Structure formats: C-alpha cells, structure tokens
Amino acid sequence: MSFFIEKEVECNFNFDYEKVAEAVVSASLEHENFPYEAEVNLTLTDNEGIHAINKEYRQIDRPTDVLSFPMLSYETPGDFSFLSDENEDDFNPDTGEVMLGDIIISVDKVKEQAVEYGHSEKREFAFLITHSMLHLFGYDHMEADEAAVMEEHQRKILDALGITR
C-alpha cells in the first residue's frame, strides 16, 4: 500500500495522526477485502482550504469536514470484480497499485466536531478517514438504506481498531 499525506496546515493533534491515518486506511482495505495493493492520498487542510475545494468541485459555498475524490466508478459499492490487470487505467504504472483516490480533511473541523460530538480528536479523525475510504469504495449515504450500510461498515472498521466514542 502507498499512502501519502500532504499537510497544508499544522496538525497540532494530541495523537500520532500519521500512524492513525495509515492504520485506518489499512483496516478499511482489509475490511472490504480489497484484492490489490492500493494507493491513497490524504490532504490535511483548514476550513478555508476545504471551503475553496468544496465550492469549486461541489458548488457548495461553505467548509465541510471531509471530501472524497474516488478514482474508480463502481456499479455496486465494495464490488471490485470489475478491476482487472488488463485495465491499465486503474493502476499506477510506476507501482502497479490501484489508485483509489484522494481524501481531504479539514483539521479545523476535526477539532470542532470532536468537541461538538463529545469524543476525542483521534476518534473524529479516524471516523472521517473511514467515512471517506468507504466513498472511495463506492459507498454513499444519499438514501437511508445506503446510510445504514455505510454506518455499519464504519462502526466495524473503527471497532476493529479499538477506536470508539
């Protein structure tokens, strides 16, 4: 697995955010039984940075906690059967890894929401990465049944890591 973190801002967390991020990405890949080596990019920004991206790509004029930019298109969430070694577009030509996509997190929102929801910054950070990884696997939460499936996957991944509220 290749996992890259780009810091656009200082990350003054009281935990090893790089270690937590990598553990969450690995646990998500394992939970979904992802059949290939994967490449994931994480950008850590602030409310101003994520606001600009949210406005540009989603036409939503406000900051958000996390944005996900999947590189793959799924017919069924979590079904990787469409991936094939013959389809070179899905693989990084230098590493041979499947390019899953990009995760962008507002460090400001991690801190704000941890206080708002009454849990640790570590839990909020891990939750947002888990949530975004599921989007990179094709899951969504536009409908109630989709949201329930996503919430169950999130809970199982975080429980496996011992990261709870």
Curated annotation (Swiss-Prot):
One of its GO terms (molecular function) is RNA endonuclease activity. Transmembrane segments: none annotated. InterPro entries: MetalPrtase_cat_dom_sf_prd (IPR023091), YbeY (IPR002036), YbeY_CS (IPR020549). Its cofactor is Zn(2+). Zn(2+) binds at residues 131, 135, 141. Its EC number is 3.1.-.-. Coiled coil: none annotated. The keyword Oxidoreductase does not apply. One of its GO terms (biological process) is rRNA processing. HAMAP family: Endoribonucl_YbeY. PANTHER family: ENDORIBONUCLEASE YBEY, CHLOROPLASTIC. Single strand-specific metallo-endoribonuclease involved in late-stage 70S ribosome quality control and in maturation of the 3' terminus of the 16S rRNA. This is Endoribonuclease YbeY. It comes from Agathobacter rectalis (strain ATCC 33656 / DSM 3377 / JCM 17463 / KCTC 5835 / VPI 0990). The gene is ybeY.
